[in-house]
Amino acid sequence: MAFPTYSSYEELLAAIDAGDSGRDILNPATKEVVGRADTHTVDDLNTAVAEAREAYQSFSQTTHEERCALLMDAADAINANAEPLAELLSREQGKPLNGPNARFEIGGAEAWTRATASFPLEPEVLVDDDETYSTLTYRPLGVVGAIGPWNWPVMITVWQLAPALRMGNTVVVKPSEYTPLSVKALVHLFQSVFPEGAIQYVSGDREIGAALSKHEDVDKIMFTGSTATGAKIIEASAPTQKRLTLELGGNDAGIVLDDVDPQAIAEDLFWGAFINTGQTCAALKRLYVPESIYDEVCDALTEYAKNVPMGEGLDENNVLGPLQNEAQYNIVVDLVEKAKASGARVLLGGEENPDRTGYFYPTTLIADIDGDNPLVVEEQFGPALPIIKYTDLDEAIAEANKLNVGLGSSVWSADRDRAIEVASKLEAGTTWINKHGTIDPRIPFGGAKSSGYGVEFGVEGLKGLGQPHVITIN
């Protein structure tokens, strides 16, 4: 299958830039213009949905084998353009090229696309006896609206796009208004291998997302973002009874047990919290540590964190970047200032740089903080981690569970059985042991409580993008 191959970031950008008709997209590290994004209207959205619906008539009749082959071609296209994609992503989102950032995200998008094409989905025999034979299969739903965030724009678009296509649906992709160029580049590559009309792209503000959510000819919405926006999507989609998969806010808790070696867990604790500069739904956002090893954990984490370089993304030495936008920067500043005003102890960071150009906020660790402090109970979504001391494990579990969110959680222990026992008491869609946020395309992922519903990834994720169909013979 022929697909475009771009030898440089500049070539890729030229293929997708909206030119004079678009709006400027700024690099959050430098405030320089990266490129110009489309400004689509609701009429443009209606056209995109109509074209997706028309393409669905034939695309839905293709086989799983045919669609899997197309996904493999799309993965090849990502691989062939990996470096230009990574540079565009770094400039637009702000994340560095190196570390678990831009190149990592593009590689993950390729790997997730291949994995989605590899999962078996055979008819399930429900009953097979002398009286009844019953099978369950999944057929396409129709048109899927994919609304993505700005933190992992390419990866999360693949999480939505690849399984929807695998199941025979057509897709209308609507990226965040902050990171439309990276997503447009990804869609451009997918469109080059899939049938015309099967993948549509619309770029715009929240009006476009709202119109997509309530569009009468859209059958399902996949959304990753805030709980507040998720609630609006639920309301908008209700009159047309759309299927929904919602991956919403997390504010994930981690509980350290008293049998760990603080030095041994410091690096994994750090990256569990600060991957993508803390801008990850399933990042570790509040850490509960027993009094008996509290100072040792704080010291080990501080010692590791202070040596992790932050800066402009195209500098190969950096592995932490800026906040992606001014609104998120202001949220982090406000929450850290409230923590400091309450008397909490700053172990690292905690001060704005008056000479900064972009939205850089230093890696910040806050100790001796009350469990009801805003930095603990509100999702900061940035490079600031509160470390809460506990003396009673049951109370720590209760504190971890008391919020109305439950995307991920983690337990840190040298005792496997003890860790599993604690993990079983945590109210979250996923609980990791001695890691945090290590997702896998084979393993279903979704939230509890107000962190959303439905799951992504694996065979279970595919099923969520199909219409169950039972055939019973008596």
Where in this protein do the model-derived segments appear?
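ALDH superfamily catalytic-core signature
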Residues: 3, 228-370, 433
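Conserved C-terminal structural/oligomerization subdomain of aldehyde/semialdehyde dehydrogenase
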Residues: 29-36, 218, 309, 353, ...
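Structural signal for hydrophobic packing residues in well-ordered secondary-structure cores
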Residues: 56, 60, 75-82, 86, ...
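Rossmann-like NAD(P) dinucleotide-binding subdomain of oxidoreductase/dehydrogenase enzymes
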Residues: 124-264, 390
